[in-house]
Every structure is written in structure tokens, then in C-alpha cells.
Swiss-Prot record:
UniProt-recorded name of the protein: Glutamyl-tRNA reductase
Annotated catalytic residues: C50
Annotated keywords: NADP, Oxidoreductase, Porphyrin biosynthesis
Annotated GO MF terms: glutamyl-tRNA reductase activity; NADP binding
UniProt binding sites for NADP(+): G189, A190, G191, K192, M193, G194
Cystine bridges: none
General function of this protein: Catalyzes the NADPH-dependent reduction of glutamyl-tRNA(Glu) to glutamate 1-semialdehyde (GSA).
Record bears the keyword Oxidoreductase: yes
Pfam families per record: GlutR_dimer, GlutR_N, Shikimate_DH
NCBIfam families, A to Z: hemA, PRK00045.1-3
Misc remark: During catalysis, the active site Cys acts as a nucleophile attacking the alpha-carbonyl group of tRNA-bound glutamate with the formation of a thioester intermediate between enzyme and glutamate, and the concomitant release of tRNA(Glu). The thioester intermediate is finally reduced by direct hydride transfer from NADPH, to form the product GSA.
Length: 444
């Protein structure tokens, strides 16, 4: 068994590529189920956000697993493997485990220390559990990862100075307009990102806010919460005429605002500039709009400079969390190593209980006058003797599984007790590869 991560993220892949490899939330169940049927894939969780699309998988062979995950991505998005391969980041074994911890703790985010990714990882994990694409390995790993991420944010101050992407969008607006009090802001999309932007706008003193969404009732609910106004999406062109700032984050797979639409709007705006921030992936706004004279469009990758604020302070806290991650990885690997010894221990117990059962049958033949109560007492005490005798050997077996050359040592252990463990030894040989895991990528 091997743990593998394959995907794209904001660090190395621009938004125009990432948006081609983004799963819609409604697709995740079907996507994970489809991936689970691929050769070599034993478990999988897919995480797809505005900054990353990553597949976390347990595979039986690294090379085969890598190929079939790439093939799945290419087939799903109707691309060629050769087209996507140059953009894919791949983490294996130790590197994959550390990457998952770092991502969930917010250390790999554009905004170091942000907490939104924790909820996104958790939701993906719950979805994977629902469609039964996780098993023993990921159920334990994700439980540890999510628990540590919560602890990291409660025991450090990394989240106190961290901005969300939505906050960064508002800060960019402040840099351009200064005081936002008199600005008319249009929020396109009533999801989590849109609401976070609205929260930050409300805190900045914005008084004129219009919310638009595909589902009008959602726009109404969010607008009422922040003393704004809701409009149906059919009135988008009219809303663009009134707005000074647009922040867009819908779940649309196509452009919501096209260049042709903005050409018409600009002619009616009488030279008034429109500042637009597109924080959606895939993008909501046609990037060619930047060619128009009165439209100033920024996408999620343009927010990098804004989120650098307080970065030095957050990196100090990130070092503390990195240390916590390294400790947790050791604990997880120790647990992982014990998996190879579980069948061996089961075989030992089974053999011992078989001897106990045969002994009981022999006693019953030799002493036919034993009452049921006497049989139960004898059985109970002989099992107790077995448990006490097995306690130390089982402890030793677990310790051997975590040591170097575990395969040979456990094979000797099996030979001493005359156990049939061919399958278990092969399983342990797989686990031994974990002691030569590739180093991780640890950049902040």
C-alpha cells in the first residue's frame, strides 16, 4: 500500500489552467466513485477548491497508481494525459502525508493560516465516507489530520492575522478606492466566498450592497442579513450599470459576465470605471474584459500581493504548527506499521484458541461427568492463561513491526510459533517500503 497525492494548486499552476481541472461540488460523489473503480486505487478523497484540485489516494503500486489517476483526470476533463502532466504536482508516501497535514492546517494556503480549507477538507472526507471510497488508512489519517488542524488553530495565533481570499478582495478594493463607504458593491454569488466578502465589506462601512444569485431566495437571505438588496440574475446588466465594485464567486462552469456584455455596459456607464474581482474557479468573468478601457479585472491569482500582509508574523506561528505536524506524522506512521502485524497476531490468537478448544474437548472425553458450569469455569480459566501467555509475544510483535528489517524479524517470529503467515509476510513487505519514503516538499 502506498499513499499518493496528484493535483494542481495555485503555487505552480495559473488559474486559467486550474479552472480546467476543477470539480463542481455536485460532481464529487460520482467522481470519487469513478476513481475508486480505477486499477490500483484502493481509497480516494478528492479536494477541489478555488486554489487547488488534489486527489488523495491509497494505491497498491505507485507507478500504476500515478498513471491511472492521471488517466482519470484526463478522461474526466476530456483532455490528454500529455496536456495535464506538466502541471501536476505529485507527492508520495511521507511527502503525501505531510502535504495533507500542511494543506488542512492552512500552511499551504495562499493565505497562510486561513481556516476555510479545514472545512473544505472535512466536507470532502465526509463525502468520500458517504460513497465508501475511504477505508482503514484514510479513515484514520483524515481523523488525525482534522483533529490536529483544529488543535493547531486553537493553540497558536496563526489564524488571528490571516486573511481569507474574500478579505483580500475587499482590501484590494480599499487600495483602489480608499474609503468604501460611498461605493456601490455588487456581490455575484451567495455561497461561502460571497458571504465572507460581504462580511468584510459590512465591517468596512459599505452601505450600498446588491446581492445576486442563481437562486434568488439565497440572495434575499444573504442580503437581509447584511442590510443589502437582492436582485434576480436576470437583472445583471442593470446591476453592472450601478456598481462601482463587483466581487464574483459563483459555481458556474461558464462565464457569467462576457466581454460583449461589458461592452454594452461600458457604453452606458459614461466613462465611470468598474473594479471587478473574480475569486471563482472556474472564473466567472471573461479575462478579455481587461482589454476594455473602463473595466479593471483582477482574478484570484492577482490577490497574492495583498495576502502578503502580516506574512512574517504568520510564518512564526507556522513553524510551531510544522513541528506539531512532524510529531503527528510519527504517530501515524507507527500506527500504519502495526497494520502489517495485525494478521500475524490474529493467526497467533487463532492457533492458541484452537489448542484451548482441543484441550477442552479432550477433557470432556476423559471426564464425561463434568457439569456445564464446570466446563465454563475451566474454559474461562484456560483462556485467561492463554491471554496472559500471549500478552508479551504480541507486544514484541508490534515492536518488531516498527523496526528496520521488519519482514525478516516477523518471519522469524512466525517460524517460532509455527504460524501460516505467507499472506501476512507479503503485506508486511509492502509496509517496509514506507521506510524509504520520498522526502516531502516543505515550502511555505
Amino acid at each position: 500500500m502506498h499513499i499518493l497525492v496528484v493535483g494542481v494548486n495555485y503555487r505552480t499552476v495559473p488559474v486559467e489552467i486550474r479552472e480546467k481541472l476543477t470539480f463542481q461540488e455536485t460532481e464529487l460523489k460520482r467522481a470519487m466513485t469513478t476513481l475508486q473503480s480505477q486499477k490500483s486505487v484502493l481509497e480516494n478523497v478528492i479536494v477541489s477548491t478555488c486554489n487547488r484540485t488534489e486527489i488523495y489516494a491509497v494505491v497498491d503500486q505507485l507507478h500504476t497508481g500515478r498513471y491511472y489517476i492521471k488517466k482519470f483526470l484526463a478522461d474526466w476533463f476530456q483532455l490528454e494525459i500529455e496536456e495535464i502532466s506538466p502541471y501536476l504536482s505529485i507527492f508520495e508516501q511521507d511527502g503525501a502525508i505531510e502535504h495533507l497535514f500542511r494543506v488542512t492546517c492552512g500552511l499551504d494556503s495562499m493565505v497562510v493560516g486561513e481556516t476555510q480549507i479545514l472545512g473544505q477538507i472535512r466536507n470532502s472526507f465526509l463525502t468520500a465516507q458517504e460513497v465508501k471510497t475511504t477505508g482503514t488508512i484514510f479513515n484514520e489519517l483524515l481523523k488525525q489530520v482534522i483533529t490536529l488542524a483544529k488543535r493547531a488553530h486553537s493553540e497558536t495565533t496563526i489564524g488571528e492575522s490571516a486573511m481569507s481570499v474574500s478579505y483580500a478582495a475587499v482590501e484590494l478594493g480599499k487600495k483602489i478606492f480608499g474609503d468604501l463607504t460611498d461605493c456601490h458593491v455588487l456581490i455575484l454569488g451567495a455561497g461561502k466566498m460571497g458571504e465572507l466578502a460581504l462580511q468584510n465589506l459590512y465591517g468596512s462601512g459599505v452601505q450600498k450592497v446588491t446581492v445576486m444569485n442563481r437562486t434568488f431566495t439565497k440572495a434575499e437571505t444573504m442580503a437581509e442579513k447584511y442590510m443589502g438588496h437582492a436582485k434576480p440574475l436576470s437583472e445583471l446588466q442593470c446591476a453592472l450599470l450601478e456598481a462601482d465594485i463587483l466581487i464574483s464567486s459563483t459555481g458556474s462552469s461558464n462565464y457569467v459576465i462576457t466581454k460583449e456584455m461589458m461592452k454594452k455596459v461600458e457604453r452606458m456607464r459614461s466613462g465611470r470605471p468598474l473594479f471587478m474581482v473574480d475569486i471563482a474557479v472556474p472564473r466567472d468573468i471573461d479575462p478579455e474584459i481587461n482589454e476594455l478601457e473602463g473595466s479593471f479585472l483582477y482574478d484570484i491569482d492577482d490577490l497574492q500581493d495583498v495576502v502578503e500582509a502580516n506574512r512574517a508574523e504568520r510564518l512564526k506561528e507556522a513553524e510551531k504548527i510544522q513541528f506539531m505536524i512532524e510529531e503527528e506524522i510519527v504517530l501515524f506512521k507507527n500506527w500504519l506499521n502495526t497494520l502489517g502485524v495485525v494478521p500475524l497476531i490474529s493467526a497467533l490468537r487463532e492457533k492458541a484458541l484452537g489448542i484451548q478448544s482441543e484441550t477442552m474437548r479432550s477433557l470432556e472425553r476423559k471426564i464425561p461427568t463434568l457439569s456445564d458450569r464446570e466446563k465454563k469455569v475451566i474454559s474461562k480459566h484456560t483462556k485467561s492463561i492463554i491471554n496472559q501467555l500471549l500478552k508479551d509475544p504480541i507486544l514484541v510483535a508490534k515492536e518488531l513491526a516498527a523496526e528496520e528489517k521488519a519482514t525478516e524479524k516477523l518471519a522469524l517470529f512466525a517460524k517460532i510459533f509455527d504460524l501460516e503467515v505467507q499472506e501476512e509476510v507479503e503485506h508486511t513487505e509492502e509496509l517496509e517500503h514506507k521506510r524509504a519514503w520520498t522526502p516531502s516538499v516543505s515550502s511555505l
